[in-house]
């Protein structure tokens, strides 16, 4: 009997502690958040709409999933109304996403506004085009295309028509300014090198020529063109130094005398 | 037990089949001007592209664009605005081009062309192409001012410039002819 009362008391105490914990209010309000997320996800596709997607330019993008930067990328979206009510295709939004995390937007493109009414049992083709920027060259990105449309009752639907990782390649087919200027720079460098080497070589040859001349030089007296020198100046010179030979020669001549 | 396993396998296989089932022919139709400028009394090239993105061929495909180019404002130079193709196989495409000539200048709304096709000889489909939208048809004179070769302008320019260039050259020739001997002496 005593043991049973102890157990009962213990159980009561445990319950009280547990209740106190609950009353503390440490449990966060997770439930409403989840329901909100669910609300966001409820905008989906309509069962009466059939959509198709096709790249027109570049034509092999449907298979190889590659674009080139700086070249137009064009695609078509087909919308088929299989139901009994009109649909209005409002717009299509295109965006580049991070390839490993598609919730991270790298670039949002201008959305294509269509506002095309599609009667029951009819189809409509819509087109859109964009350029991939050079900064995306050589890396994969996630291309996501969503089509937003309404039915006659005003219900909004969103269809994802393309959601793939694509490779963006650098366009190296045409003339690129970078390589062009590199080429011009190299040409200029080689011309400069030629000029410098020519200069150096001519300097070398001139030096050797000078040394030779120094050895051979014997004065210019024999080659003087006297027509250019005034008469009196020539006479004065003759008076002052009649001998045109070098001082060494003169000395030797005196000795001989 | 074995039976239930088989049943499960069947369910799985049928689910996969739903995912990869063949789609009927689905034609995407594309209308696009190839000329950069639309000019009155000059050729304007339009291209229509049909892409069958379904898994089955599309039968008896027609393009009808007669309503978007009324003959009182457009001449059809080459090509047909109503074309018929017997079949477009799955995954292939067809392009068709037309040369037209606008008769008047001003804004013009390029609307959608209508494409019809059959899947399985029974289901008739009507598709509208994309709309290139509103475009401006240039006046001929405006276009010439920007792009035509300007021969008359050059001729007038040379006539205006003639007194100062040709006139001075003639004067120089006259004065040169007046002194033939002096020039000879100098050269010798």
Curated annotation (Swiss-Prot), chain B:
The keyword rRNA processing does not apply. It is a single-pass type I membrane protein. The chain crosses the membrane at residues 152-172. Glycans are attached at residues 93, 109. Keywords: Endoplasmic reticulum, Glycoprotein, Membrane, Signal, Transmembrane, Transmembrane helix. Pfam families: TRAP_beta. Residues 173-188 are cytoplasmic. InterPro entries: TRAP_beta. Its main location: endoplasmic reticulum. Heterotetramer of TRAP-alpha, TRAP-beta, TRAP-delta and TRAP-gamma. TRAP proteins are part of a complex whose function is to bind calcium to the ER membrane and thereby regulate the retention of ER resident proteins. Belongs to the TRAP-beta family. This is Translocon-associated protein subunit beta. It comes from Caenorhabditis elegans.
């Amino acid at each position: 009997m005593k043991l049973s009362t102890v157990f009962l008391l213990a159980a009561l105490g445990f319950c009280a502690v547990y209740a106190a914990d609950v009353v503390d209010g440490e449990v966060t309000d997770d439930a409403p958040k989840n329901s909100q997320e669910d609300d966001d996800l409820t905008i989906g596709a309509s069962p009466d709409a059939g959509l198709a997607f096709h790249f027109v330019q570049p034509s092999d993008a449907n298979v190889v999933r590659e674009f080139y930067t700086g070249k137009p990328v064009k695609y078509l979206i087909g919308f088929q109304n299989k139901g009994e009510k009109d649909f209005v295709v409002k717009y299509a939004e295109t965006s580049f996403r991070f390839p490993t995390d598609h919730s991270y937007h790298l670039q949002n493109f201008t959305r294509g506004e269509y506002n095309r009414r599609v009667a029951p049992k009819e189809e409509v083709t819509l087109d859109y085009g964009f350029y991939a920027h050079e900064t995306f060259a050589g890396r994969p990105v996630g291309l996501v295309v969503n089509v937003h449309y309404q039915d006659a009752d005003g219900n909004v639907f969103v269809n994802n028509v393309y959601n793939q990782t694509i490779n963006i390649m650098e366009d190296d087919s045409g003339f690129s300014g970078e390589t062009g200027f590199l080429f011009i720079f190299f040409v200029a460098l080689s011309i400069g090198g030629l000029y410098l080497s020519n200069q150096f070589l001519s300097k070398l040859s001139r030096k050797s020529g000078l040394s030779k001349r120094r050895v051979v030089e014997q004065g210019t007296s024999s080659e003087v063109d006297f027509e250019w020198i005034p008469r009196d100046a020539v006479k004065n010179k003759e008076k002052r130094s009649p001998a045109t030979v070098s001082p060494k020669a003169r000395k030797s001549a005196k000795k001989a005398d | 037990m074995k039976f239930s396993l088989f049943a499960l396998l069947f369910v799985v296989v049928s689910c996969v089949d739903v995912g990869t089932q063949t789609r009927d022919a689905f034609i995407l139709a594309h209308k696009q001007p190839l000329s950069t400028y639309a000019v009155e009394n000059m050729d304007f090239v339009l291209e229509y592209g049909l892409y069958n993105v379904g898994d089955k061929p599309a039968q008896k495909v027609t393009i009808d664009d007669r309503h978007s180019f009324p003959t009182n404002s457009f001449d059809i130079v080459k090509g047909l605005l109503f074309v018929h193709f017997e079949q477009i196989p799955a995954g292939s495409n067809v392009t068709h081009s037309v040369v037209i000539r606008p008769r008047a200048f001003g804004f013009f709304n390029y609307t959608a062309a209508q494409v019809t096709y059959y899947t399985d000889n029974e289901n008739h489909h009507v598709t509208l192409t994309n709309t290139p939208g509103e475009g401006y048809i240039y006046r001929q004179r405006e276009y010439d001012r920007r792009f035509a070769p300007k021969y008359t302008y050059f001729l007038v320019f040379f006539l205006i410039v003639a007194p100062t260039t040709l006139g001075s050259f003639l004067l120089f020739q006259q004065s040169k002819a007046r002194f033939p001997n002096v020039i000879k002496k100098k050269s010798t």
